């Protein structure tokens, strides 16, 4: 196993998690995860066009695999960002050779930062929800899946209204990519847990 910020006690096997959590993560973070390799040229192209046309950095094009590469191997923040991105791409290609998509997703959910010092889904579930990851509800899953995009903004302890707004984006992404029906999404949004 590769280096992880998680202790063995906090590492969660992906097959113990509710399927809807995995689906929420894929829908909001990398909806083409199962279809592309280490990098997604379509997402990168879209990000470049959008960023250039708006004259600012609005979105990235990193895949889940690239995020795993970054989480596991690139600790130093003061590295040249272009060199770091190139190295991240090479590491991502290597990860895709060594691990299945399921294993990469497992590494992602165990190393991603959720804010408040919580690394990985187990710490986030325990810290924010006071429950074990296997016990999270669909509502919980959609909230947690939205946090890693910007933990300092979307953590529920920071701004519950922004957390809720981001959660609704996750829910709508799940509808868009076929993981939830619009009826299920509407009930979830109205239910408020």
Predicted regions and their residues:
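Juxtamembrane regions of bacterial inner-membrane/periplasmic proteins
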Residues: 1-193
């Amino acid at each position: 196993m590769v280096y992880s910020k998680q202790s063995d006690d906090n590492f969660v096997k992906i097959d113990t998690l509710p399927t809807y959590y995995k689906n929420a993560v894929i829908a909001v973070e990398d909806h083409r995860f199962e279809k592309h390799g280490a990098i997604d040229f379509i997402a990168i192209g879209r990000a470049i066009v959008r960023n250039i046309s708006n004259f600012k950095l609005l979105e990235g094009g990193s895949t889940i695999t690239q995020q795993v590469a970054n989480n596991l191997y690139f600790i130093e923040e003061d590295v040249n960002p272009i060199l770091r991105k190139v190295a991240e791409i090479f590491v991502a290609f290597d990860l895709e050779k060594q691990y299945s998509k399921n294993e990469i997703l497992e590494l992602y959910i165990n190393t991603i930062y959720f804010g408040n010092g919580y690394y990985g889904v187990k710490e986030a579930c325990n810290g924010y929800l006071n429950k074990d990851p296997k016990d999270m509800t669909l509502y919980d899953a959609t909230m947690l899946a939205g946090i890693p995009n910007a933990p300092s903004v979307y953590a529920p302890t920071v701004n519950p209204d922004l957390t809720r707004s981001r959660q609704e984006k996750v829910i709508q992404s799940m509808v868009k990519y076929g993981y939830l029906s619009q009826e299920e999404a509407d009930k979830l949004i109205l239910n408020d847990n």
